[in-house]
Amino acid sequence: MAIEMQQIIELILAIFLPPLAIFIHGNDCNMHVAVNIILCFFFFVPAVIHALWYCFFRA
């Protein structure tokens, strides 16, 4: 199983800029981006967890 460059970029962004990682993964500004922006303002760690879930574990 090879790790693609897109996945590496999304992982780095999910840790440092979670809303941007979700935006790039989804290719649009959807509800998950808005939820993640709100999470970033109030709780940064849950925003990172949400971004990791959205980019890597969501089916």
Curated annotation (Swiss-Prot):
Regions that span the bilayer: 5-25, 37-57
Gene: pmpl-1
A GO cellular-component term linked to this record: membrane
InterPro entries tied to this protein: PMP3 (IPR000612)
Protein name stated in the entry: UPF0057 membrane protein F47B7.1
Annotated keywords: Membrane, Transmembrane, Transmembrane helix
Family indicated by similarity: Belongs to the UPF0057 (PMP3) family.
Disulfide bonds: none
Keyword Lipoprotein annotated: no
UniProt source species: Caenorhabditis elegans
PROSITE patterns, per the entry: UPF0057
Subcellular location: Membrane
Membrane topology: Multi-pass membrane protein
Alphabetized PANTHER family for the sequence: HYDROPHOBIC PROTEIN RCI2 LOW TEMPERATURE AND SALT RESPONSIVE PROTEIN LTI6 -RELATED, UPF0057 MEMBRANE PROTEIN C04G6.5-RELATED
